[in-house]
Every structure is written in structure tokens, then in C-alpha cells.
């Protein structure tokens, strides 16, 4: 609304001076998506669609069947193109997979099985040709490993297109959930001088000419670098998020994070996306309840909004996936301490590749076993302080910390979090024990000097969530352009 004062000094509503400009810039689309066409009940009606050819089949009856997809749905829309069209022989009968087209015609009820609508074309305009001889995505099925070589094209396949739509839904659900919970969305730095995890597995950021330095035999002097100190790509936005949680009460970050781990596994990426909420005045119980509500909301949204894609994953990728997600949504999460979990693992008859001992990290095989025994998600708490980062709150026993990991069936850990250490002296002691230079974290320590409060948070790797929801076996297939050791293509 736009208000101004009249000559009588009263407020009057007038048209905003930029309103007409905005309307012209944001004109409604004048074509219809494939998804809308396939689900339309307003028939018959004229429509225009824009998309890419999946297949073409010529009929002896004097027309061609074109399967067109625009990425808005898993299924294609069948276009019936009659021979009477002026470019039928010259263009339509030469269409191959990958060609882009604009089709106008009448959307009608389809007599064919497996589809509710089809488009009877009055015009088929070819926008971009695609060489059928060299186009990689032919009819034959390619392995996911092979498709990674064509990451710039693989979203055009059924599976990867469905993965990206689910990834989008999860991302949207994350934002909506935290907005509903009263959290502020916070942008934390990607370039940082802090190591949140204290593991040192970080990518170095520098503008110095390293080749020139190597040839000069001079020592590496960070004072000559852009930031005049060692800097890295962030492994987490948690520490920065804590600073804003102690001002705004509830915040969350959602952005790219980086780990320089030389791990070539189906569960690890060098670059991935993390969502990290932080809440002041939260203890570990509050944190666990938030994590449970969060996962249930995300999974529920995927089932509600991605029905066709989820049916596809349930049938083609992992049988029973939908029932598994429904079970997670409907059942309360089981709670178990780390110590209880270790005792269960030691008492069971299962043969594990990695031995189980109190004081060591649980492996994925241990986590999967626990969820299978419980028959649903498990939240493990109270881990040994020796295997957890310095910022986690030390428990009264002095041996454990107020940490939590959320484990889900088939995958294991999907969320990791904790109540943060709010006591200045304990935090300083933990940093010293970990060999951390307190002067590098002076701003973080300051939070405990000026109005410290109990607070907690957790982290969820987006790709782990997408992998779990879709059932995809390899994490490299749930991110558009995977970054792994030896691979930074595209």
C-alpha cells in the first residue's frame, strides 16, 4: 500500500508509483506446466506447453506421439501431432530425445491407459535441436556412476529429476518449519578463521601464489595473505549462530559447508549443505524434542507434496520406503544413553566389523543395528566427553557431555547436536584440554562473560536427509554437482 497526505492533511490511499512497473515486470506465465496438464480436470481447453522431447513414436495412421517433459513432474505428457501440421515431415518426424519444443493445442481427456490427459497439437515449434547420435541420455539405462560423468544432463533422467524435486521440497520444508517455530534465518560466513569441530580437516583459503612461494624457498607468511591470518572454508556455522542465538533467542543457518576429509565413501562429500538451529534457553530435552518435530515435519511434507516421486522411489529404489517414513512420522522416538547402547551392542550376537568399546565412536553398522532392534528412530545421548567437541556441555559425572545423535533405520546418524557449554570456566578448561588457542576464540568465550544462558542446537546434513527420504544408495547422487576427493568437475 502507498499512503500520502492530501491538501487537507488527511491520509489517503493511492496507487504505489511503481505498481504499474511491477505488474509489467511480473507478468503471469502464458504457458501451462506438464504437471498442471496431467492433473487438470478442466477439459477440454487450449494450452501451450514448453519442454523437452523424451520419445517420439510415429503411427501409420498419419500422426506422431510425442512424450514431452518439463521437469515439473515425473510423468510425461503425451502430445498427438497430426500429419496435417505444416512442419510435420520436415521437423516433427525428425524430433529425437532432448529436443526442446513449444506445443500449442487442445488438452483433452485421454482414452489411453495410464494417463488422464493428452494434448492434441495444433502447432509444434522446435526451439532447440538435439543430435540423437551424440546425446548421452539414450533409451538404454545408464548406471548412476556413469550418469555422474554427465552431471550437467543427469537431472533430465527420471531418477535424478525426482531426487532434485524431493531435495527442493526438503529445503522448502526446512525453512517453513523453522519459520513456524519462531526461528530467524541467519547467514553465517563461509570463510572463517575458526575450526568448530577442532579436527583440522579444513580447506585453506589463500590468494598467495603457492607455486611462486615454493620456488623461492621462503616460508609461508600469512601476514602477506589477503586476511593476514590463516583462513579456511567453514565446516559449520554453529559457533557464529550461537552469537546470534544469544541475542535473537532462536536462529538457524542453512548453507554450504566443507570438510577436507579424504573419504571416498557413499556417505561423504567434501562440499554439502547443513541446517543448524541454535536456541537460547534450550536444554538437551528441548533440543531432542525440536529435532523430532523437525524430522517428522520434513518427512511428512515429502509424502504430502511429492507423492508421484515418492511412489517411484518406493517401487524402483527402495521397497517399503513410504511405510518406513510413515512409521518414523507416527512413532515416538526411542531414547537411549550411549552407555546403554554400548551394553546392548556388547550383549548381542551380531558380528560387527568394528569392535565396540565404551569411549569410542559408534560406527554406522552399530547405529543401524540399534534402530533395527528398536524398530524405529533412536536418540542417543550422554556421550563420553573424550570423543566429542569442546563446546558440548559437560555432565555432572565429569565423564560425559550433553550430546545427542538421532539415528534413523537403514542409515544411522542423521542429526548430531548438543546442549552447549555455557559455563566460562568449564569451557576454558575444555579448550585447553583440546589444545585450542583461546585467543582465536575470544569472541566465542565472550558469550559466557556477558549474560551467558543455557542454549542448544543441532546439525542436519541436507544430503543425508535426501538420501534417507529417497533411498538413494550413494550421497553423490543427491546433490547436483558432487565434490569428492579427486573430483571437482562442472
From Swiss-Prot:
Protein's UniProt name: Asparagine--tRNA ligase
Gene: asnS
GO cellular component labels: cytoplasm
Pfam entry (one): tRNA-synt_2
Subcellular location: Cytoplasm
Self-association and partners: Homodimer.
Superkingdom, taxonomy of origin: Bacteria
Keyword terms: Aminoacyl-tRNA synthetase, ATP-binding, Cytoplasm, Ligase, Nucleotide-binding, Protein biosynthesis
Molecular function as annotated in GO: asparagine-tRNA ligase activity; ATP binding; nucleic acid binding
Protein family per UniProt: Belongs to the class-II aminoacyl-tRNA synthetase family.
Enzyme Commission number(s) from the entry: 6.1.1.22
Catalytic activity field: tRNA(Asn) + L-asparagine + ATP = L-asparaginyl-tRNA(Asn) + AMP + diphosphate + H(+)
Organism annotation: Rhodopirellula baltica (strain DSM 10527 / NCIMB 13988 / SH1)
Gene Ontology biological process terms, A to Z: asparaginyl-tRNA aminoacylation
Amino acid at each position: 500500500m502507498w499512503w500520502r497526505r492530501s491538501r487537507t492533511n488527511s491520509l489517503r490511499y493511492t496507487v504505489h508509483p511503481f505498481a504499474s512497473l511491477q505488474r509489467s515486470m511480473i507478468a503471469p506465465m502464458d504457458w501451462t506446466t506438464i504437471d498442471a496438464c496431467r492433473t487438470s480436470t478442466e477439459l477440454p481447453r487450449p494450452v501451450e506447453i514448453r519442454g523437452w522431447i523424451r520419445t517420439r513414436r510415429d503411427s501409420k495412421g498419419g500422426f506422431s506421439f510425442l512424450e514431452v517433459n518439463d521437469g515439473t513432474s515425473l510423468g510425461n505428457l503425451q502430445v498427438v501431432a497430426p500429419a496435417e501440421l505444416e512442419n510435420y515431415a520436415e521437423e516433427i518426424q525428425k524430433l529425437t530425445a532432448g529436443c526442446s519444443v513449444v506445443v500449442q493445442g487442445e488438452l483433452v481427456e485421454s482414452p489411453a491407459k495410464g494417463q488422464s490427459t493428452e494434448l492434441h497439437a495444433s502447432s509444434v515449434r522446435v526451439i532447440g535441436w538435439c543430435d540423437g547420435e551424440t546425446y548421452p541420455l539414450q533409451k538404454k539405462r545408464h548406471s548412476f556412476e556413469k550418469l555422474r560423468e554427465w552431471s550437467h544432463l543427469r537431472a533430465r533422467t527420471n531418477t535424478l529429476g525426482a531426487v532434485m524435486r524431493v531435495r527442493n521440497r526438503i529445503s522448502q520444508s526446512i525453512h517453513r518449519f523453522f519459520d513456524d517455530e519462531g526461528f530467524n534465518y541467519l547467514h553465517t560466513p563461509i570463510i572463517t578463521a575458526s575450526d568448530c569441530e577442532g579436527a583440522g580437516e579444513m580447506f585453506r583459503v589463500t590468494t598467495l601464489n603457492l607455486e611462486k612461494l615454493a620456488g623461492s624457498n621462503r616460508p609461508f607468511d600469512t601476514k602477506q595473505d589477503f586476511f593476514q591470518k590463516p583462513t579456511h572454508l567453514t565446516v559449520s556455522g554453529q559457533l557464529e549462530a550461537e552469537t546470534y542465538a544469544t541475542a535473537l533467542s532462536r536462529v538457524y543457518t542453512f548453507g554450504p559447508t566443507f570438510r577436507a576429509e579424504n573419504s571416498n565413501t557413499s556417505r561423504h562429500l567434501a562440499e554439502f549443505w547443513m541446517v543448524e538451529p541454535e536456541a537460547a534457553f534450550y536444554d538437551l530435552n528441548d533440543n531432542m524434542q525440536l529435532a523430532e518435530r523437525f524430522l517428522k515435519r520434513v518427512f511428512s511434507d515429502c509424502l504430502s507434496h511429492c507423492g508421484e516421486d515418492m511412489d517411484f522411489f518406493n517401487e524402483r529404489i527402495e521397497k517399503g520406503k513410504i511405510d518406513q517414513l510413515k512409521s518414523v512420522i507416527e512413532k515416538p522416538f526411542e531414547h537411549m544413553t550411549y552407555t546403554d547402547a554400548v551394553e546392548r551392542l556388547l550383549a548381542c550376537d551380531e558380528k560387527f566389523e568394528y569392535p565396540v568399546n565404551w569411549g569410542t565412536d559408534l560406527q554406522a553398522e552399530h547405529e543401524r543395528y540399534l534402530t533395527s532392534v528398536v524398530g524405529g528412530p533412536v536418540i542417543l545421548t550422554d556421550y563420553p566427553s573424550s570423543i566429542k567437541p569442546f563446546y558440548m556441555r559437560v555432565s555432572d559425572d565429569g565423564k560425559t557431555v550433553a550430546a545427542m545423535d538421532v539415528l534413523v533405520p537403514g542409515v544411522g546418524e542423521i542429526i548430531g547436536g548438543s546442549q552447549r557449554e555455557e559455563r566460562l570456566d568449564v569451557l576454558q578448561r575444555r579448550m585447553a584440554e583440546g589444545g585450542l588457542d583461546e585467543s582465536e576464540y575470544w569472541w566465542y568465550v565472550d558469550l559466557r562473560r556477558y549474560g551467558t544462558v543455557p542454549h542448544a542446537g543441532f546439525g542436519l546434513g541436507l544430503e543425508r536427509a535426501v538420501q534417507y527420504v529417497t533411498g538413494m544408495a550413494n550421497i553423490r547422487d543427491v546433490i547436483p554437482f558432487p565434490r569428492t576427493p579427486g573430483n571437482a568437475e562442472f
